């Protein structure tokens, strides 16, 4: 599997033999959005990633452009791993409740590292040696 990070689009591009999987970092708050999964796309240095599929240039705009539409943005943006309690009314992947009973979680991208080969797991069986791996 090939893994690339395209800095200009802030996009992760993962390719298998027949499929492509793309996710992008969006806005100043570093939301992680699902861009594409499907038939393999051809990547070239001159072709930008299809981040237009996220439709962040349309209403509801990203919070840095129009914070009044934050809830609408959170409810419609295709989060890669959606949280709960902050405006996204779809099914969440993670739910958090504090000791005081408050709910809400908003995960944000901080950094990543792409390693050349999947590390061995001591004491555990391991499959597919030699594959690239991404830590986000």
What positions do the PLM features span?
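Acidic-aromatic substrate-binding/catalytic surfaces of carbohydrate-active enzymes
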Residues: 9-127
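Secretory/endomembrane lumenal or extracellular ectodomains immediately following the signal peptide
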Residues: 129-132
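Short, Gly/Pro- and small/polar-rich lid/capping loops
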Residues: 1-10
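Conserved small/polar residues in nucleotide/adenosyl-binding loops
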Residues: 134-136
């Amino acid at each position: 599997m090939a893994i690339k990070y395209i800095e200009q689009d802030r996009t992760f591009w993962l390719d298998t033999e027949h499929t492509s999987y793309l996710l992008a970092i969006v806005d100043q708050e570093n939301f992680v959005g699902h861009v594409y999964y499907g038939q393999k796309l051809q990547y070239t240095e001159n072709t930008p990633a299809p981040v237009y599929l996220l439709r962040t240039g349309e209403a509801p705009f990203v919070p840095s452009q129009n914070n009044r539409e934050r809830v609408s943005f959170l409810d419609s943006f295709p989060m890669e791993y959606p949280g709960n309690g902050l405006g996204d009314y779809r099914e969440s992947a993670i739910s958090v409740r504090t000791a005081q009973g408050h709910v809400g979680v908003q995960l944000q991208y901080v950094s990543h590292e792409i390693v050349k080969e999947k590390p061995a797991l001591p004491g555990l069986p391991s499959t597919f040696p030699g594959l690239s791996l991404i830590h986000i």
